[in-house]
Amino acid sequence: MTIKILPPQLANQIAAGEVVERPASVVKELIENSLDAGATHIQIEIENGGANLIRIRDNGIGIAKDELHLALARHATSKIASLDDLEMILSLGFRGEALASISSVSRLTLTSRTAQQNEAWQVYAQGRDMETSITPASHPIGTTVEVANLFFNTPARRKFLRTDKTEFAHIDEVIRRIALAKPQVAFTLTHNNKLIHRYKSAVTNEQKIKRIATICGNDFMQNALHIDWKHNDLHLSGWVIQPQFARHQNDLNYCYINGRMVKDKVITHAIRQAYSEYLSNEKYPAFVLFIDLNPNEVDVNVHPTKHEVRFHQARLIHDFIYQGMTNALTSEQTNIPIQSEQSNPTKVAEPQGIWNLTTHNKGNRATAGKNIFAQQPKDYDKKSSQFKPHFAANYSEVTPKKAVQKAYAELLATHEEKTIASSTLPHQFTHNATHISEQKNVLHALALIENKALLLQQNQQYFLLSIQALQHFNIRLQLQQSNIAQQTLLIPILLRLNKQQYQSWQQQALFFQQSGFDFTDNSAQRRITLNRLPICLRTQNIQKIILQLLDQPHEKYTIFLTALCSHLEFPSLSTFSEAVNLLTKTEQQFSTQHQLEFQSLLVKIEWDHYLDKLQ
């Protein structure tokens, strides 16, 4: 048989085999189009499990008359225009395959009107021929897509559809997943003219929590822990079930990457690992998690259904999620009784920063292009940026754990006021003298200077403390503990060494072990494999640091430790509270032998010269 180019109709039907698996796939693709169009109210009407009719109506921006033909064409889209756009997907859809694939296996009618048009227009396409005709229609601003007789021209595929009840259950699950990610959008779902769900638009945090309770159940919310975990451009937020209330079925796990529902093995493994010490193999965790990260760091163009993603730094993502989950599961948190939308509303304590309250869409390229960062990353290209916060825009200060709150209360207390309890972290420290020592001569933190140093006072003397030196000292103290907290790597780091580096490794292997590193040594091939590392170094470029330490051997552990700390890199601290928090954590690790070392970090300020100039 000779090689031929397939006819467009056949190519579309092949594509439909990947995109349109069942009626629920059609519903998912059409709702994502509505969301990309900026819809705030979406109606879903289903007949006979979606086999006979799927009708999606929205109040989005609509499609212009002269673009209706293109809307049904394959690889026609308004969401990307170049390879650069493909590297940074901000919308839910982007391939331009859905409508063409759906129309090739059904009778599809698309009716739409934009705000600039006085009347609506309707386009109809049917089956393999996909010939379209446009006629005037009556319709408000927005779009309605009707998909009738799905798989009417592919009997083999229609035969494999399950019962109406089963197919509708899949559709219902799709709606639930999307409704969790888009609280600001109202959804109405009917089946055979019977109202099944009505999710009202959720504006306040209380309303959004109630939507989660409505979808996941009151039992879940009453026994769930709130998680809010950040590291650089990564942000993990949502709710996780307490281990003692884990489920016997793996049926309540919702995970979203930048607002897109996904199923990813890296994420699943990190979550299971965090729960591993609490759950048996017969129990499953329940969670609703939102992961926000730079879109350049994740590839969503992996599978036609877009359920699968690929991370550029999978190990970093895994470790970040694992640490966030572990922190949530081990922290003390108060359960909040929640009532669903159908119940009488009860006053609910407002959580800190789950949702972004402003989620309107801008532009066509960015249709659903709501970016997920509260602040733009330093290495991000500003010229190509259309970043807008996804969940982080209205974040207030993250509520600290009770232990941290107690520490701050003690820090802010004077000798006469140590019985006063504080439950909240002050936002302004400009005029607060912060106690950081239990010595008779109390040392006070007064201000953060240029994000580089803390101004401290002791009696009538003033000192500067370098933030970088404090960060290094903090790590040094953690690495000198007798029981160093370690983290197992999902993917061990394999290092092939030259002869000189391997000799250096043999000389310093004990030093690495004392510092909390766990290596496997293959002397025959001069290879070492890092299996575990100190948790305090998990955000560092550890491979680079190890090689730097091996390039210059150190004979004493103290010298080794100093060299290790000198290679560390830390993000700058932007607020006074962060600096005080770091100082607090450092002081909590103090012993008598560390006092002199800490004092050596202080630079005394002599004011006489400056005061003389004022006279």
From Swiss-Prot:
A GO cellular component annotated for this chain's UniProt record is: mismatch repair complex
The record, for Gene3D superfamilies, names:
3.30.230.10, Histidine kinase-like ATPase, C-terminal domain, MutL, C-terminal domain, dimerisation subdomain, MutL, C-terminal domain, regulatory subdomain
Q: List all membrane-crossing ranges.
A: none
Q: Can you supply a Gene Ontology BP term from the record?
A: mismatch repair
Q: Which Pfam families match?
A: DNA_mis_repair, HATPase_c_3, MutL_C
The name under which this protein is listed is: DNA mismatch repair protein MutL
State the species of origin.
Histophilus somni (strain 2336)
Underlying gene: mutL
* UniProt keywords, alphabetically: DNA damage, DNA repair
GO molecular function (one): ATP hydrolysis activity
SUPFAM superfamilies according to UniProt? ATPase domain of HSP90 chaperone/DNA topoisomerase II/histidine kinase, DNA mismatch repair protein MutL, Ribosomal protein S5 domain 2-like
NCBIfam families with a match to the protein in the record: mutl, PRK00095.1-1
Mind telling me which PANTHER family this protein's record contains?
DNA MISMATCH REPAIR PROTEIN MLH, PMS, MUTL, DNA MISMATCH REPAIR PROTEIN MLH1
List the InterPro entries hit by this protein, alphabetically: DNA_mismatch_repair_CS, DNA_mismatch_repair_MutL, DNA_mismatch_S5_2-like, HATPase_C_sf, MutL/Mlh/PMS, MutL/Mlh/Pms-like, MutL_C, MutL_C_dimsub
| Task of the protein | This protein is involved in the repair of mismatches in DNA. It is required for dam-dependent methyl-directed DNA mismatch repair. May act as a 'molecular matchmaker', a protein that promotes the formation of a stable complex between two or more DNA-binding proteins in an ATP-dependent manner without itself being part of a final effector complex.
Write out the similarity annotation: Belongs to the DNA mismatch repair MutL/HexB family.
